[in-house]
């Protein structure tokens, strides 16, 4: 790009950023004052992001509600939900919007040039010219409104953000995070909840909502980011001509102020909700939180990420271990909250006794003082630095575009100092510097300065209170009832009329004219070829070795996968324990802390996990694999094999104290995941009533597994002998050469030495004689509800269409998009107020529908049962069909990094899926007609009529409709 050609902009900075292989430009738009950052490189997965500094003054959630609302129609795209139309009919690789404590951003990504331009256009129009000024229904739908259907009915609140935040305020971990922000930053925007506190959201007026947009959504307060391989000059000219030149620069007071440091540490106690029957003793959270300098100090921030690893995250880390040894909490963890002006460091003990707060603080201080006096464990620091450097170099962000993540990183400085946008993109020199400084007392000085001598800190104690959620619900209901009683007949009729008017607005069909404002690609714009698989099969002394031959930039991704088909049924759940024990207990030559640090000092990590695959020729069973995965530079293959042998052959599985620590930590983590991802939990459990894959997953990672962990934790002394015996027995069943399949992602150079290493590795596997066992699937339609202390629900309905005689077809992928962004979106989210909803249809015949942070239960199930009729009566012209097809293809065509190419190929091989199968599915999608969609109606009806239900949610909502369930219990 030649910045001199861009006369509407002033070039402020230009530099080559070798760490991420990009050329950076910082510009200012002359007329509007917009800040613009460009990262030019060869990446075809292009990213656009427009963000605004949006400091909230209160906890009404105005920034969050506005983030939802601007995407509900604009000047050039006057639909009710252009965002959804884009999801349905765009080839995007990312499309979303996010509210942070101090900023709101609107990022999009696509590999298709025309599609990328369309996405930019819709988003620029949305933020600068939204329809919120024309339609107050948008505010009432997305934010909050009074809901009243009849004079005699209950007055309630409804709104997408309102219900989303009710879900967010249900989790103890979320409560702790909010109280930490509140205590550390009482005089800044960080001291309020940008997402919105459900008790405050109804205080937001429509006028204040509009004022917030007028104040902050101006180019002078904007940060525009472009990344990738594109004509940057053309994009700059388009933005200038179409939008930015229509605004004059103005002063926007949105700077984020520093919190004045405290003279002494703040100490507060706060309650969080638990259910009747949940323990009150040893169920508190103790948290010590310290503000760490400024986010503008990149080296300090990288160093504290390393310190979090070395002090708290790594197994055996000194602060964590000291607290566990003193029985302060059953789970101890740390967090370093960055991405804000003043990052903070937290040490948390969960399932603790609130009366041991002083002991908690004393142990932390004593341990840190000892480290300062005697020095850090240099291997732990080396491992921490290598861990973060490896991640930075690898730049593997899973399915998220690399440019998106870099675009989020730039805000860590750019938002607070507009002259430092590139700071967080250049970290390799910092890692080199930290390696030298580690030997000179640098980290010890950080501990003394920021963790020991720092009074800008808070101690937050969360204590459980039974019935708090019900108490809060009752207060809200009472407040609404009193308000209703204060209203005149005319005012009540007005609320009823408003409720009906909002429903009518939501049900109003979009006009063809409005729909056609959203640009749409043609079917012919989509490539016909399906994905390529990389599965070169080799035989090494009877063992299958899969070589996924792709360029990996010198990194090898190794998977040793062991078939567990002969594991006896009673040992199946203990595989879920074993995967979290191996690598985290002492071995012959290392303590578990030394082992973890040695591995992370030389590799990108070695991890164990369980995977389940279909057996296409046998729907009554599944393939269950225990995997050991490692990633490393090619020259570390010897080391990796040696460490895996050390773990498999010499792990101390009889260390009772360590096993109990691991079980307690696993239980704590799984409890959080089951509640926070309640939709996935409910789907897994409902499908476990009939599906071999889900039944197995539930027993090793779901509610069934949680029940085992709870029993082991609470009755450890009685169960420990059996636990140890089961783990030792499992080793002999699993880690045998006849069970092994190897999967390796590397180029030819990386692969060359592997076969010899595998042959040697197999000689050291178990050969003990064992009696082959087999899994027994305990299928039963349980139709359960699991009560949590939350205030919203996660509702799942599942069935299997293959058992009803129907076959999988690519058209089911189109149906998934139709349901997720049309039928379910309108009925569950827009009308029902849930935050999320979706459907999934698998090759094995599974059909699963679920909702997320949903205020309803029975109403939602009724909507699900209407899917068949919706499909039967679905009408679409060629344009609409094309839109759904494009949206479906965008889900298939996610750009893959080397690791993902290897994992996709491996998964396809185990599932028995070929390139021809993928091609057939793609052809079925691209050639789909309205008749193909209609043909799915009976399939859906047949599957969902099996009526496998599971709900995770609030006690009040579940008890109100308990007749829907065969069994109700606390989670």
Sequence positions of predicted segments:
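Non-catalytic terminal extensions that flank enzyme cores
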Residues: 1-47
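His/Glu-based metal-binding/catalytic segments typifying zinc-dependent metallopeptidases
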Residues: 40-42, 49-51, 162, 166-170, ...
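M16 family metallopeptidases and their MPP-like homologs
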Residues: 45-55, 81-129, 136-147, 174-199, ...
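Active-site His/Glu-centered metal-binding helix of metallohydrolases
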Residues: 62, 66-70, 578
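Hydrophobic, small-residue-rich alpha-helical packing segments that form membrane-like cores
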Residues: 150-221, 225-243, 247-275, 280-282, ...
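Non-catalytic, conformational "gating/processing" segments within enzyme and secreted inhibitor domains
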Residues: 158, 210-242, 702, 723-758
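Extended, regular secondary-structure scaffolds
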Residues: 211, 223, 232-251, 374, ...
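Aromatic-residue-lined binding/catalytic grooves and analogous aromatic/hydrophobic interfacial grooves
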Residues: 446, 454, 710-724, 728-734
């Amino acid at each position: 790009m030649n910045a001199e050609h861009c006369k509407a902009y002033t070039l402020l900075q230009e530099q080559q950023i070798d760490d991420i292989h990009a050329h950076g430009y910082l510009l200012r738009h002359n007329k509007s004052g917009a800040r613009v950052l460009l990262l030019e490189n060869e990446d075809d997965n292009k990213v656009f992001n427009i963000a605004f500094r949006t400091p909230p003054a209160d906890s009404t959630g105005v920034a969050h509600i506005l983030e939802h609302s601007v995407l509900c129609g604009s000047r050039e795209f006057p639909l009710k939900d252009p965002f959804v139309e884009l999801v349905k009919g765009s080839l995007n690789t990312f499309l979303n919007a996010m509210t942070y404590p101090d900023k709101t951003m609107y990022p999009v990504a696509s590999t298709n040039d025309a599609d990328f331009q369309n996405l930019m256009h819709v988003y620029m129009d949305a933020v600068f010219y939204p329809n919120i000024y024309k339609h107050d229904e948008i505010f009432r739908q997305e934010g909050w409104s009074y809901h009243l259907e009849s004079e005699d009915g209950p007055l309630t609140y409804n709104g997408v953000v309102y219900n989303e935040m009710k879900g967010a305020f249900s989790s103890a971990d979320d409560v702790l995070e909010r109280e930490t922000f509140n205590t550390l930053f009482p005089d800044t925007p960080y001291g309020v909840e940008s997402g919105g506190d459900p008790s405050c959201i109804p205080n937001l007026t429509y006028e204040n909502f509009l004022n917030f947009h007028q104040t902050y959504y101006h180019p002078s307060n904007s940060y525009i980011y472009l990344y990738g391989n594109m004509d940057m000059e053309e994009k700059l000219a388009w933005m200038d001509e179409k939008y930015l030149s229509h605004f004059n620069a103005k002063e926007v007071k949105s700077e984020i102020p520093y919190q004045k440091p405290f003279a002494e540490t703040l100490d507060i106690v706060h309650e969080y909700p638990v259910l009747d029957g949940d323990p009150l003793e040893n169920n508190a959270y103790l948290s010590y939180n310290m503000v760490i300098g400024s986010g503008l100090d990149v080296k300090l921030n990288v160093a504290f990420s390393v310190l979090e690893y070395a002090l708290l995250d790594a197994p055996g880390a000194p602060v964590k271990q000291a607290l566990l040894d003193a029985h302060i909490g059953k789970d101890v963890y740390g967090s370093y909250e960055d991405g804000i002006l003043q990052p903070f460091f937290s040490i948390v003990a969960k399932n603790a006794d609130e009366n041991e707060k002083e002991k908690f603080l004393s142990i932390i201080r004593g341990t840190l003082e000892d480290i300062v006096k005697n020095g850090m464990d240099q291997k732990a620091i080396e491992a921490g630095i290598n861990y973060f450097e490896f991640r930075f170099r690898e730049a593997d962000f899973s399915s998220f575009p690399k440019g998106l993540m870099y675009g989020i990183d730039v805000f860590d400085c750019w938002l607070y100092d507009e002259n430092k946008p590139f700071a967080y993109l250049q970290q390799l020199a910092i890692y080199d510097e930290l390696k030298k400084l580690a030997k000179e007392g640098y980290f010890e000085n950080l501990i003394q300065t920021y963790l020991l001598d720092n009074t800008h800190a808070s101690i937050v104690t969360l204590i459980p209170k039974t019935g708090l959620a019900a108490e809060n619900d009752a207060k809200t209901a009472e407040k609404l009832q009193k308000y209703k009683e204060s209203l005149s007949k005319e005012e009540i009729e007005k609320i009823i009329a408003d409720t009906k008017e909002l429903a009518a607005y939501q049900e109003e069909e979009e006009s063809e004219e409005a729909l056609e404002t959203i640009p749409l690609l043609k079917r012919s714009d989509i490539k016909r070829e399906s994905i390529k698989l990389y599965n070169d099969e080799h035989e090494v002394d009877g063992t299958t070795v899969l070589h996924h031959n792709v360029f990996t930039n010198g990194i090898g991704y190794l998977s040793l996968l062991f078939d567990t088909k002969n594991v006896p049924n009673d040992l199946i759940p203990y595989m879920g324990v074993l995967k979290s024990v191996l690598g985290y207990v002492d071995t012959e030559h290392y303590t578990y802390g030394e082992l973890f640090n040695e591995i992370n000092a030389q590799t990108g990590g070695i991890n164990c996990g369980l995977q389940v695959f279909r057996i296409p020729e046998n729907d009554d069973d599944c393939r269950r694999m225990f995997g050991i995965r490692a990633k490393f530079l090619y020259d570390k293959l010897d080391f990796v094999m040696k460490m895996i042998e050390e773990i498999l052959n010499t792990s101390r599985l009889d260390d009772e104290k360590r096993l109990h620590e691991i079980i307690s930590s696993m239980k704590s983590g799984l409890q959080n995941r089951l509640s926070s991802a309640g939709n996935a939990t409910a789907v897994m459990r409902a499908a476990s009533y009939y599906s071999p894959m889900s039944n197995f997953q539930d027993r090793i990672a779901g509610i069934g597994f949680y029940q085992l962990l709870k029993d082991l934790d609470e009755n450890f002394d009685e169960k420990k002998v059996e636990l140890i015996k089961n783990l030792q027995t499992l080793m002999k069943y699993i880690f045998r050469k006849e069970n092994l399949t190897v999967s390796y992602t590397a180029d030819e150079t990386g692969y060359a030495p592997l076969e010899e290493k595998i042959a040697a590795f197999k000689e050291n596997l178990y050969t003990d004689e064992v009696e082959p066992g087999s899994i027994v699937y305990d299928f039963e339609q349980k139709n359960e509800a699991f009560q949590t202390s939350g205030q919203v629900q996660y509702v799942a309905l599942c069935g299997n269409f293959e058992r009803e005689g129907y076959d999988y077809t690519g058209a089911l992928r189109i149906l998934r998009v139709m349901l997720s962004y049309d039928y379910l979106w309108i009925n569950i989210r827009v009308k029902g107020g849930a935050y999320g909803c979706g459907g999934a249809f698998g090759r094995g015949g599974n059909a699963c529908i679920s909702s997320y942070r949903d205020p309803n239960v029975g109403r939602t199930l009724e909507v699900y049962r209407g899917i068949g009729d919706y499909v039967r009566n679905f009408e679409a012209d060629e344009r609409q069909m094309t839109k759904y097809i494009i949206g479906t293809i965008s889900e298939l065509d996610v750009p893959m990094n080397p690791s993902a190419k290897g994992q996709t190929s491996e998964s396809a091989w185990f599932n028995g899926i070929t390139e021809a199968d993928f091609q057939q599915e793609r052809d079925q999608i691209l050639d789909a007609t309205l008749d193909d969609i209609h043909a799915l109606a009976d399939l859906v009806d047949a599957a969902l009529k099996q009526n496998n239900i599971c709900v995770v949610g609030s006690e009040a909502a579940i008890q109100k409709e308990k007749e829907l369930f065969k069994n109700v219990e606390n989670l």
